[in-house]
């Protein structure tokens, strides 16, 4: 082996550095494998603990930092289903059900908005006049109908898709009718 290759081989065999940071620490691989993460993303529609915390579930309350100090955001990666089975001995049945619910596919999905008949009538009337309302109209509707503006925006998107679908179906039925009458003649 040439001297330069021997030097390269010796460099690869050198002892690991004792830096204050490492790939394992950055990735969180140096933590205990069977610990449960305390931080959860803020999803008020999915919170299982009450405001008092008396229902048995632990709630983590983080105080606000002093003004002028900012912290990097914590990214919560979903735990794989197979790791959930490791924790079955440590949690009660209700806690396991809650954990499984969190691990399911709909974890971050918000609940479906149930519009009242009055809200639908108002939205339909506005849609007949303008199927692309601007932000000012949507915010005004949100205030009048006691809804969030983004829910109104989604309603209009869905309503436009429904109109497009029904228009496409009517075009198909007209073409089918014309085709059938031409065959009979």
From Swiss-Prot:
Subunit structure comment from the entry: Can form heterodimers with PROP1 in binding to DNA. Interacts with TLE1.
Residues in the signal sequence: none
The cellular location(s) given in this protein's UniProt record come to: Nucleus
The keyword Protein transport is assigned to this record: no
Name of the featured protein: Homeobox expressed in ES cells 1
Which keywords does UniProt give here? Developmental protein, DNA-binding, Homeobox, Nucleus, Transcription, Transcription regulation
The main location is nucleus
